[in-house]
């Protein structure tokens, strides 16, 4: 298999120029292009002030991007927030696709705090994802994914927590709140699979300066699976309190809310330990730890729900979902 080309500014300019010529608007130097991320392979580019160009750099990403175009059309009528619209798509290199999307106005959840009204927007998002017919999503190629074992995740988090304690990053006794029986009670319930965005991180939530959630980006990782995964993602993006309030407003009961909370908590412990192991003494490494530390703090916010919940067999787990 040949090596995929690395996108460059010249690559992007040539592609944008060709698109402008097709649209009959060529002329002049064309819009400014610049990579969105400062590091890594520059696969996402700003094109002027109004568009975003995303370039697939491997076959798997190509398949996911092609599926995303159809999935966004399926999701759009069900959710109260904006979903990106593609104005052009095709191949930028043999077998590798591009999508040129309209930029959604606003910042991210890493730049703006989500307000109470924004939490209602998130509730509408979770509710809308639950309403997307699973069979229609499957026909688009959205995969079904089995729920993760919370007990296995808990054990892995416990195993690395002492390393974080020695680095003065985390108090391992906090994990004692989740016991093996507690993890078993928070197992995903049969028949609860819904469409899950699966990457509701702060950078994928478009938030306006007034705290409203205006849109959701990057649907390439969407699956049919455990709704607690999106609650966990929101806990990392906006904090456990806001995530649980949004999920409760969307109709989810205590069990999926607490499951999402503990998925997020264990994930952040594991991620911070991984990032600490990989660091050196340089200033960039210190900066790279800022976001994992912030997400850990958000996930470990104390919430009232976990203090007042006692599970029984007849507990209501959430909406009556059909997968």
Predicted regions and their residues:
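Conserved strand-to-helix beginnings and helix N-cap segments that scaffold or border functional pockets
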Residues: 65-66, 228, 286
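Conserved catalytic motifs of the protein kinase core domain
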Residues: 48, 96, 191-193, 212
